[in-house]
Amino acid sequence: MLKNNFKKPVVFLSIVFALLYTLFPFLYMVSVSFKVKKEIFAMPPKYFNFDPTLEHYWYTFFDQIPFFKFMINSFIVTSVSTILALIIGTLAGYSLSRFRYPGTLKYHIAFWILSTRMMPPIIVVIPIFIFFSYFGLVNTKLALIIAYTAFNIPFVTWMMRSFFLDIPKELEESAMVDGDTRMGSFRRIILPLAKPGLAATSIFCLILAWNEFLFAVILTETEISNTVTFAIALGVSQYQANWGYMAA
């Protein structure tokens, strides 16, 4: 009993310390967004004893930068690319987990799909830019949607393949014995059972697409297609960095 009573405070303090350690950068960023430039660079740092200001938020949302436009662009690009990647990758993952292929072709296809995700995006950004320039897609949201979808499909394929392999084939076979089709059993039985996998995979795709910066800089030029990551980068110039704006 004494040992258990001793463990509880230790566990609680460990959790509190972990939370503070994890949240400190975020909380400090929030405090920076309310500081004037002089207080941002004050030494020693001022964590609480500063005069708050909304200057950076006004500059971000209502002054010179169309931040709401960038938010809408990011939302459109992220949501559409995630939906497309989920549709294509889920079907591909189902195919690799259920269908038969000649010889070792299935493993070659699976490795090829995985290898496309191994490449750093910076390796293919120039060919992609030339390709999109040829078709007049540079500075459009469609270019970002295609790029993000292409890079998320391998991830979705491998994630959903592993989830489908954990679902017994007998469930589909019994449904098809009762007269259902392959796609019918996939839609009515497999997909509902794979909802946790779809949810986890979609969250990862949303995060990857929302935070992507390289293609957002290379493939967009104006506010018509600029995203949030590009807008944040506007805070860094040749001579200074507007930390208050970027924190806001």
Q: Can you describe what each PLM-predicted range is?
A:
Residues 2-248:
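A structural signal for multi-pass alpha-helical bundles of membrane permease subunits
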